[in-house]
């Protein structure tokens, strides 16, 4: 095997390792890979080991994007294998008793738009309906008017459509009050519930002491009279509650004689303003899950206590329970997820709206350039395990990159730019591909006439810089430099940073909005024509062009 071939193999193996792990590998790891791939070279291990540090320096000098581009040109099969491995991971375990089809539901409260936590519930249920066939209900759980934002009805529907959720039926619980009253009456007749007129605080104290409420022992006839009086408006808010009889000594106090229906007059319902008797979640959910024929319910383990409550209702009516699966909690660092917290921040001007990039809503992710396919893939990768986990932004970004990379044309963005005059350089122009290794997509031509825009942070370092796709310069002052030849090999030997640059005459002002703040700078003028599309700013990352105002680009940073 020739020395040049050995060096090329080492370079490719180093690139594969760096792309896979998003970091420059250790020399020992590369030596082991070389020996594993070419056992006949073990006698040359010493010479090969001496080559590795120099090659790793070359790999380290490349950006993440450049490493992938190099690897794609040298060994496209390696990238394909990485993607195949990801695809194989996008599977979930089989559900029991699902072979003949399933009936499942996504049932949010319309208090605001959907966020990443909602995405998990909707995607997991949608996955199984698409796998087995059947019905998928979008059930709007809007029986608590205090938690209903009228604008959320439309926002949630839009979010589900964006996410590609295959809803087959839509049900509004606020259209079903008569059904809940009917089953509340039946439950009273069965002796499975009672109408409690005790003070709520007194009831809570008794419950914690495992002492039954006196109302628990009243007759069915008296319960039905109180129920009719409640529906007739003879009780004020807080004066009466329908409670389900459970075990007053149950180990979980939340399960003991839980509330199922109440009077609420202080907040009118936006869809049903005449209603004042409202079922609580556990009652309406149990009734609807049965009547709509749910076969499987997949939700977070914070609902385990609710499942225990609902089981009492199922048992009183003699209904068959669905199969319940409770997945672990998922913490999401770095973004606001609380609907009340988001609304407060919007009202106070802290956030620009529900799609502010500091929020974890799906519409905020979409505005940044995150694709629904990536959210789905990342969610399925997380799976349904009952162990609590932390959401992986790295995985979401990797999934998103796999979706957007092929369509993202490459351009320069110069942050915090300074104008630099370069002495001694020939008047020339740079030719850069719109997309690596695809000449049919065209090229960008950047003319050089003596003055360029460069990142201030790079100018402050001094020394030699390599202007990408152009030539080398030596920095001579805050706004000056001199031509230092065209040799890329010389730039590498001097460990010169490869930097993006722009001609001063044609650069377009550009604001790049990131979660950390706004980066002011300049982009290539062609970016003005990419409104609503995603580009990759070389050595910066993917960005979605959000607006173009009077020749200025407003872009949202997606990820690297």
UniProtKB/Swiss-Prot annotation:
Q: Which GO terms describe its biological process?
A: amide biosynthetic process; glutamyl-tRNA aminoacylation
Its EC number(s):
6.1.1.17
Q: Which UniProt keywords are given for this protein, alphabetically ordered?
A: Aminoacyl-tRNA synthetase, ATP-binding, Cytoplasm, Ligase, Nucleotide-binding, Protein biosynthesis
Query: Which GO terms fall under molecular function for this chain's record?
Result: ATP binding; glutamate-tRNA ligase activity
Q: Which InterPro entries match?
A: aa-tRNA-synth_I_CS, Gln/Glu-tRNA_Ligase, Glu-tRNA-synth_arc/euk, Glu/Gln-tRNA-synth, Glu/Gln-tRNA-synth_Ib_cat-dom, Glu/Gln-tRNA-synth_Ib_codon-bd, Rbsml_bL25/Gln-tRNA_synth_N, Ribosomal_bL25/Gln-tRNA_synth
In the UniProt record, the signal sequence range is none
Q: Which Pfam families match?
A: tRNA-synt_1c, tRNA-synt_1c_C, tRNA-synt_1c_C2
The reaction(s) catalysed by this protein are: tRNA(Glu) + L-glutamate + ATP = L-glutamyl-tRNA(Glu) + AMP + diphosphate
Where does the source fall among the domains of life? Archaea
For this record, the Gene Ontology CC terms, alphabetical, are: cytosol; protein-containing complex
Q: Where in the cell is it found?
A: Cytoplasm
PANTHER family in alphabetical order: GLUTAMATE--TRNA LIGASE, GLUTAMINE-TRNA LIGASE
Which protein family is it in?
Answer: Belongs to the class-I aminoacyl-tRNA synthetase family. Glutamate--tRNA ligase type 2 subfamily.
| Name this protein carries in UniProt | Glutamate--tRNA ligase
- The protein's gene is named gltX
């Amino acid at each position: 095997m020739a020395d040049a071939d050995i060096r090329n193999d080492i370079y490719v193996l180093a690139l594969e390792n760096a792309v896979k792990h998003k970091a420059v590998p250790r020399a020992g790891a590369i030596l082991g890979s070389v020996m594993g791939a070419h056992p006949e070279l073990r006698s040359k291990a010493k010479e090969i080991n001496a080559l590795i540090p120099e090659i790793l320096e070359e790999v380290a000098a490349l950006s993440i994007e450049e490493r992938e581009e190099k690897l794609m040109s040298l060994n496209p099969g390696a990238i394909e294998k990485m993607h195949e491995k990801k695809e194989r991971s996008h599977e979930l375990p089989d559900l029991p008793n699902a072979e003949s089809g399933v009936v499942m539901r996504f049932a949010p409260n319309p208090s605001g738009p959907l966020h990443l936590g909602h995405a998990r519930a909707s995607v997991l249920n949608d996955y199984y309906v698409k796998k087995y066939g059947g019905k998928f209900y979008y059930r709007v759980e809007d029986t608590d008017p205090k938690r209903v934002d009228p604008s959320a009805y439309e926002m949630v529907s839009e979010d589900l459509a964006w996410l590609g959720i295959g809803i087959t039926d839509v049900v509004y619980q606020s259209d079903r009050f008569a059904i809940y009253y009917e089953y509340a009456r039946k439950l009273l007749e069965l002796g499975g519930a009672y109408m409690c007129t005790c003070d709520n605080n007194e009831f809570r104290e008794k419950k914690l002491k495992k002492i039954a409420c006196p109302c628990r022992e009243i007759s069915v006839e008296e319960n039905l009279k109180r129920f009719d009086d409640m529906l007739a408006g003879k009780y004020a808010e807080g004066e009466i509650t329908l409670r389900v009889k459970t075990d007053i000594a149950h180990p979980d106090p939340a399960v003991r004689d839980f509330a199922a229906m109440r009077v609420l007059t202080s907040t009118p319902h936006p869809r049903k303003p005449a209603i004042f008797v409202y079922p609580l979640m556990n009652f309406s959910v149990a009734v609807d899950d049965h009547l709509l024929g749910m076969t499987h319910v997949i939700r977070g383990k914070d609902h385990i206590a609710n499942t225990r409550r609902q089981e009492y209702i199922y048992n009183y009516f003699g209904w068959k329970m669905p199969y319940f699966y409770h997945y672990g909690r998922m913490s999401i660092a770095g973004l606001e997820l609380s609907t009340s917290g988001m609304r407060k921040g919007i009202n106070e001007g802290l956030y620009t709206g529900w799609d502010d990039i500091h929020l974890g809503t799906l519409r905020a992710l979409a505005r940044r350039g995150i694709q629904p396919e990536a959210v789905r893939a990342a969610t399925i990768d997380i799976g349904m395990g009952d162990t609590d986990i932390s959401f992986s932004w790295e995985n979401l970004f990797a999934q998103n990159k796999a979706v957007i990379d092929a369509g993202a044309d490459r351009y320069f963005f110069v942050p915090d730019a300074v104008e630099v005059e370069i002495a001694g350089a020939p008047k020339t122009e740079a030719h850069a591909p719109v997309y690596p290794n695809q000449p049919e997509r065209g090229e960008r031509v950047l003319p050089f006439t003596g003055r360029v825009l460069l990142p201030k942070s790079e100018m402050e370092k001094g020394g030699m810089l390599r202007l990408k796709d152009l030539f080398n310069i030596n920095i001579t002052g805050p706004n000056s430099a001199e031509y230092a030849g065209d040799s890329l090999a010389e730039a590498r030997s001097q460990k010169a940073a490869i930097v993006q640059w722009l001609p001063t005459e044609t650069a377009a002002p550009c604001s790049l909005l990131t979660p950390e703040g706004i980066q002011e700078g300049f982009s290539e003028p062609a970016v003005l024509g990419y409104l609503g599309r995603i580009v990759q700013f070389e050595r910066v990352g993917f960005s979605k062009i959000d607006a173009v105002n009077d020749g200025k680009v407003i872009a949202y940073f997606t990820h690297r």
